[in-house]
Amino acid sequence: MSSASMFGSLKTNAVDESQLKARIGVLALQGAFIEHINIMNSIDGVISFPVKTAKDCENIDGLIIPGGESTTIGKLINIDEKLRDRLEHLVDQGLPIWGTCAGMILLSKKSRGGKFPDPYLLRAMDIEVTRNYFGPQTMSFTTDITVTESMQFEATEPLHSFSATFIRAPVASTILSDDINVLATIVHEGNKEIVAVEQGPFLGTSFHPELTADNRWHEWWVKERVLPLKEKKD
């Protein structure tokens, strides 16, 4: 994806301190960060904001690494030593971190495919990803994915179906440990491909849930992954 935002401008969410449930940072070096922030700021009790420096990472309850160019985002992380060290510290601390598309690549232990190697990976998840698995940007598509029963999506029907947008998307081509929980798959050219995984506090989705009108992934992540860990710490 290009670095330009696809939808509108950044929106804020005025939340009284007594009603504040979670502070969600979105890495804002490049990619579709505005869309994630705007969705998060539409959720009751959530404040979301851009993360560009190590200082921006202070007092956050969760972090989203958005889609974009994994090589570009990786380079920008790598040249900012303070930000890089802070992100690695958040991984070591077990902060809930969600990577979408390029963000999933950055969370992986290994990556392959693409024109250039990734200059930096956080190596938080025991997966190997294949970049640009479905082809170039001209072959982007939207399709229904099947999510597991454990997702516990609410309200919107069908309960376990979700329309997902894939833009030069990766897949989790190799699972490197039994600690990986597969959350969603699609069938592509007759093969079942893994497009969403989690490992402990880390979530990776190869698609862009921020580019649809369905906010269930964001709501689920806050309710089922961010808030329980925050409550344990509090």
From Swiss-Prot:
One of its GO terms (molecular function) is glutaminase activity. It is found in: Cytoplasm. The keyword Cytoplasm applies. The active site is at C101 (nucleophile), H208 (charge relay system), E210 (charge relay system). InterPro entries: Class_I_gatase-like (IPR029062), PdxT/SNO (IPR002161), PdxT/SNO_CS (IPR021196). It comes from the Eukaryota. The keyword Cytoplasm applies. Its main location: cytoplasm. Its EC number is 3.5.1.2. Pfam families: SNO. Keywords: Cytoplasm, Glutamine amidotransferase, Hydrolase, Lyase. One of its GO terms (cellular component) is cytosol. Disulfide bonds: none annotated. It is an enzyme of class 3 (hydrolase). One of its GO terms (biological process) is pyridoxine metabolic process. CDD domains: GATase1_PB. L-glutamine binds at G68, E69, S70, R131, I167, R168. Coiled coil: none annotated. It catalyses: L-glutamine + H2O = L-glutamate + NH4(+). PANTHER family: PYRIDOXAL 5'-PHOSPHATE SYNTHASE SUBUNIT SNO, PYRIDOXAL 5'-PHOSPHATE SYNTHASE SUBUNIT SNO1-RELATED. Belongs to the glutaminase PdxT/SNO family. NCBIfam families: PLP_synth_Pdx2. This is Uncharacterized glutaminase C222.08c. The lineage of its organism: Eukaryota, Fungi, Dikarya, Ascomycota, Taphrinomycotina.
